[in-house]
Amino acid sequence: MSGAARAGPARLAALALLTCSLWPTRADNASQEYYTALINVTVQEPGRGTPLTFRIDRGRYGLDSPKAEVRGQVLAPLPIHGVADHLGCDPQTRFFVPPNIKQWIALLQRGNCTFKEKISRAAFHNAVAVVIYNNKSKEEPVTMTHPGTGDIIAVMITELRGKDILSYLEKNISVQMTIAVGTRMPPKNFSRGSLVFVSISFIVLMIISSAWLIFYFIQKIRYTNARDRNQRRLGDAAKKAISKLTTRTVKKGDKETDPDFDHCAVCIESYKQNDVVRVLPCKHVFHKSCVDPWLSEHCTCPMCKLNILKALGIVPNLPCTDNVAFDMERLTRTQAVNRRSALGDLANDSSLGLEPLRTSGISPLPQDGELTPRTGEINIAVTKEWFIIASFGLLSALTLCYMIIRATASLNANEVEWF
């Protein structure tokens, strides 16, 4: 496997960490400190001697708002062309301010335009403060961003409280409001507990991953060593068995020279005078130069699959199938020229046929195109191992990135919003 191919997963892991580090975190905005606002509301209903009062503890000063106390009557925008205007975004937004009112506070709903536009429009009509209520019932107030609005105080409250106040104003009931500075809330930075959690989680993940990889490669090494020992044992046994097999030289008049006699099943050539042949225990005959490499690897007859080790009593309990596959590429390279020549002669000679060899259970020799997948299979195996290693690295990087984002992410209540 090439170095570039190995570097591919590593580049993915590096890219994952880079993406994590460049994540457009809203936590940077959320890390801004903010101040809570304590709001007391007094409602004077007609015909009621004692005014109704309630307190709002979940208000929040805007980021660019002065943190100061203010008091005044609450007013909502007048309808525009008969349509209620709760947002304060329209250029025609107006407020009816009674002549006896010196300080008043605008009540507006969030949405449709930026906080800066709403606050600036209320300030244009001389409001001393703006209270903006949320437009989503289940959301807490956020820290509003409204640079350039001057000295006007801006506070956000929940939708529920805002609509409660608005309901009184729509009935022409006087509502007085006092806004006081509450608690300063420090930035919500990466807490020590989160850091410990991320560190422990990542260490545990890496330990598990490393243990799995160590176990995997130990097993692989053990398997490889056992296979190599078995191969050496079989190789030694095969050499010993080959030395005990009968070898003779074909002479004139021997049955092997008969045209009807089976050809050598390995090289598919007929036997000629002075050829050295090997006679196996099953009585099958092959060229010595052809069958010896085969027996060294397979220790079985190429035709009937007889185990020569068992037949000769050398290794009776060790099957030849434990050995690795015979390297046909090496054999065919040594016999390539002769085999192709023999195949050409057999194709041109109608008196000779390959049918007896086929019926004898001989597996056809692979062609050159069939040998190339062996290298491809090796590459696939190596690629698979590197993929397993790289997968754990990539998974660890992504997990660490996810945990960091989760640990640093703040609640919606700590977000800074522009509109």
From Swiss-Prot:
Phosphoserine modification, residue list: S341
Topological region Cytoplasmic: 218-419
Domain PA: from-to ranges: 105-176
Positions of RING-type zinc fingers: 264-305
Signal sequence interval, chain numbering: 1-27
CDD domains: PA_GRAIL_like, RING-H2_RNF130
Glycosylation, residue list: N29, N40, N112, N135, N172, N189
Chief location: membrane
Induction remark: Regulated by lutenising hormone (LH) in Leydig cells but not in germ cells.
Keyword Glycoprotein (UniProt): yes
Segments crossing the lipid bilayer: 195-217
Cited InterPro entries: PA_dom_sf, PA_domain, RING_finger_E3_ligase, Znf_RING, Znf_RING/FYVE/PHD
Localization per record: Membrane; Cytoplasm
EC number: 2.3.2.27
Pfam family, one: zf-RING_2
GO molecular function term, any single one: ubiquitin protein ligase activity
Any single GO CC term annotated in Swiss-Prot or TrEMBL for this entry: membrane
Pathway: Protein modification; protein ubiquitination
Tissue-specificity statement: In testis sections, expressed in interstitial tissue and seminiferous tubules. In tubules, expression is mainly in postmeiotic germ cells and to a much lesser extent in Sertoli cells (at protein level). Expressed at high levels in liver, lung, stomach, heart and thymus.
UniProt membrane topology term: Single-pass type I membrane protein
Catalyzed reactions per annotation: S-ubiquitinyl-[E2 ubiquitin-conjugating enzyme]-L-cysteine + [acceptor protein]-L-lysine = [E2 ubiquitin-conjugating enzyme]-L-cysteine + N(6)-ubiquitinyl-[acceptor protein]-L-lysine
Record topology, Extracellular segments: 28-194
Keywords: Apoptosis, Cytoplasm, Glycoprotein, Membrane, Metal-binding, Phosphoprotein, Signal, Transferase, Transmembrane, Transmembrane helix, Ubl conjugation pathway, Zinc, Zinc-finger
Function: Acts as an E3 ubiquitin-protein ligase. May have a role during the programmed cell death of hematopoietic cells.
Protein name according to UniProt: E3 ubiquitin-protein ligase RNF130
Source species: Rattus norvegicus
Name of the coding gene: Rnf130
